[in-house]
Amino acid sequence: MDNLSNYLIVSAVLFSIGTIGVLTRKNAIVVFMCIELMLNAVNLTFVAFSRHLGNLDGQIFVFFIMTVAAAEAAVGLALFIAFFNNRESIDIDDANLMKW
């Protein structure tokens, strides 16, 4: 196997772990971390293909994805803090109680 295959296998494993975590966990912070893991798996794929093809387009795209992910993390954690202050729990099953 060449290097691209190794990177894609690692990326697929990371994405699978993230997907399983999103589907099975009930803690919102753990689900959020699993979503970030899936996002980083996609970033690894972009960088691997960018290096394999010899251009920087994928790496530039990853830079923008990481910028958006940082903003997403800040907003997501602020929402978790507000949810915890309101319900004193971060369980996903309690999130449906915040309906108007």
UniProtKB/Swiss-Prot annotation:
- What family does this belong to? Belongs to the complex I subunit 4L family.
The record's Gene Ontology cellular component field reads: NADH dehydrogenase complex; plasma membrane
Q: What is its EC number?
A: 7.1.1.-
Q: Where are the transmembrane segments?
A: 4-24, 29-49, 60-80
Broad EC category: translocase
Subcellular location per the Swiss-Prot or TrEMBL entry: Cell inner membrane
Its biological function?
NDH-1 shuttles electrons from NADH, via FMN and iron-sulfur (Fe-S) centers, to quinones in the respiratory chain. The immediate electron acceptor for the enzyme in this species is believed to be ubiquinone. Couples the redox reaction to proton translocation (for every two electrons transferred, four hydrogen ions are translocated across the cytoplasmic membrane), and thus conserves the redox energy in a proton gradient.
> Which UniProt key words apply to this protein?
Cell inner membrane, Cell membrane, Membrane, NAD, Quinone, Translocase, Transmembrane, Transmembrane helix, Transport, Ubiquinone
Query: Oligomeric state and partners?
Result: NDH-1 is composed of 14 different subunits. Subunits NuoA, H, J, K, L, M, N constitute the membrane sector of the complex.
Q: Which InterPro entries match?
A: NADH_UbQ_OxRdtase_chain4L/K, NUOK/Mnh_C1-like
| Source organism phylogeny | Bacteria, Pseudomonadati, Thermodesulfobacteriota, Desulfuromonadia, Geobacterales
GO function terms (MF aspect): NADH:ubiquinone reductase (non-electrogenic) activity; quinone binding
Give a GO biological-process term.
Answer: ATP synthesis coupled electron transport
Top-rank taxon, per record: Bacteria
Catalytic activities: a quinone + NADH + 5 H(+)(in) = a quinol + NAD(+) + 4 H(+)(out)
* Organism field: Trichlorobacter lovleyi (strain ATCC BAA-1151 / DSM 17278 / SZ)
Kindly name one Pfam family recorded for this protein: Oxidored_q2
Which gene specifies this protein's sequence?
A: nuoK
The way it spans or sits in the membrane comes to: Multi-pass membrane protein
Name assigned to this protein: NADH-quinone oxidoreductase subunit K
